[in-house]
Amino acid sequence: MLGLENTKYEVKGTSKFKKQLKKVVKLGKDINKLIEVLNVLASGETLDEKYRNHNLINNKYYKDCSECHIEPDWLLIYKYNNNEIILFLIETGSHSDLFN
């Protein structure tokens, strides 16, 4: 997916993520920024602090998910399935797109 380099995790996007990604592309966002983040996550490495990576807690819809900031108002919601070694890309978009 998206030309990722050698990775520890298989990367799978939900249908919602894929739809939102098309919107992000239409908005002119730099997809290379997303690919940079995905390469780190899919390798099982820790993101740099600038991405403000954190677990989403107290949210039934995003149970066991994490969120990072690709840009100040461009987020990625994802989760790992370590049993199957998969990185699931749940959603991407702005704060208002994802939490309203």
Please give the residue ranges for each predicted region.
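Residues that form or immediately flank small-molecule/cofactor binding pockets and catalytic motifs
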Residues: 16, 58-61, 94
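Short structural boundary motif marking the start of a folded domain
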Residues: 7-13
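A secondary-structure boundary/capping signal
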Residues: 13, 52, 91-94
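Enriched for short, Lys/Arg-rich terminal
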Residues: 1-7, 19, 26, 31-32, ...
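Generic leucine side-chain signal with a strong bias for well-ordered alpha-helical environments
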Residues: 38-41, 56, 87-89
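N-terminal first-folded block
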Residues: 13-40, 46-48
